[in-house]
């Protein structure tokens, strides 16, 4: 019986070069990032002492914590809802297979700008513009999330099956009808999934933007940290973790229902 030997696949020079570039970037970034793993191990005792100050959590003001957590959720709800509404037209206008280049290129750059700036930066700007409070947080999440969802929606639109759209076009439908009956039904499950995920992310982001005065539990958390009230800080962190975990569970069930 003749033995057939299969030669191993040859590594392309491009693949080897790519790995070399990745390794070089990691090496160069080591110094810039001031990586110090040995210091982390050396100061482990101090970190353990610091961590012990967080226990037991102080839930004595739990009613105030729940009130601020509710405000944080409301900030995330409105920031996400407004972004979902606006991301649909912007996402469609960012899709290369729906509109000409002179439409999608400017819209993409606008969405890049919304996405490139962190929510914290937007929150600081809106705190100056509209004052302290939850509304500044809503606007910050709204702008950033619009950029993210528009990007995700445009990629989903560009990956749709052209058959249904062509079939609707063959009936004499106009462009709007093609989008309503051929495009949106294909991407709507993904849009719902992306929106639920961004809502989870926005709850966490709403906590952070609160630290710069944009309302919610972030304000209380920052005051506890700044006042070295670590047991209260731990209680607030536990509440945030439990809330995000519950939202993750609920959104997972909803995603299974829609997809």
Swiss-Prot record:
Residues 69-251 form the ABC transmembrane type-1 domain. It holds the Pfam family BPD_transp_1. Signal peptide: none annotated. It is a multi-pass membrane protein. It comes from the Bacteria. GO terms for cellular component: plasma membrane. Keywords: Cell inner membrane, Cell membrane, Membrane, Transmembrane, Transmembrane helix, Transport. It is found in: Cell inner membrane. GO terms for molecular function: ABC-type phosphonate transporter activity. The chain crosses the membrane at residues 13-33, 75-95, 123-143, 176-196, 205-225, 230-250. InterPro entries: MetI-like, MetI-like_sf, PhnE/PtxC. The complex is composed of two ATP-binding proteins (PhnC), two transmembrane proteins (PhnE) and a solute-binding protein (PhnD). Part of the binding-protein-dependent transport system for phosphonates; probably responsible for the translocation of the substrate across the membrane. Belongs to the binding-protein-dependent transport system permease family. This is Phosphonate transport system permease protein PhnE. It comes from Escherichia coli (strain B / BL21-DE3).
